[in-house]
Amino acid sequence: MWAKADSYAVFKYGINWFEAQDYCESLNEKEFAGYDDWRLCSTEEAKSMFSFTKSSVDKDGSEIHIDEVFEPDGGHNTWTYVEKPDYHQYAEKFSYITGNEFWEHKDNEYSHVRLVRDASEREEYEPEWRKDTKKFQR
């Protein structure tokens, strides 16, 4: 189950990977749409939304290839929870313009997040770095 809008709809600017995690936590604390298990998606989940046969527009008016059921005028990419092995300063992002995944430094602020949740029960996940850090405040 995907959130209908992405982080750009809320903030009106790009966010880094840590802010994406904080955004997710804040929605879970508020029980957004009645659920408290929202999370960043995997790369495969991000790919599952992409199709060249689908068309919508991002915040800049560029064509993105996701279903029109999702709110238009959002970001053109999404952070995933996938961290680069042996180089944890990078996380994987997925582009809804090109359909490509790529590594991006976690501090990059020209990014967005589309949150997802499982329809069934799942094991609680908390990234290792989160256990000893505070929430990022802008």
What residue spans do the PLM features occupy?
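An exposed tryptophan-centered "aromatic clamp" motif
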Residues: Q21-D37, T43-K93
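Solvent-exposed, polar surface segments
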Residues: V82-Q137
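A sequence-level detector of short linear motifs
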Residues: W2-K4, H65, W103
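Extracellular adhesion/carbohydrate-recognition regions
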Residues: M1-W38, H112-V116, E123-R138
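Short, solvent-exposed coil/turn segments at beta-strand boundaries
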Residues: M1, G74, Y96-G99
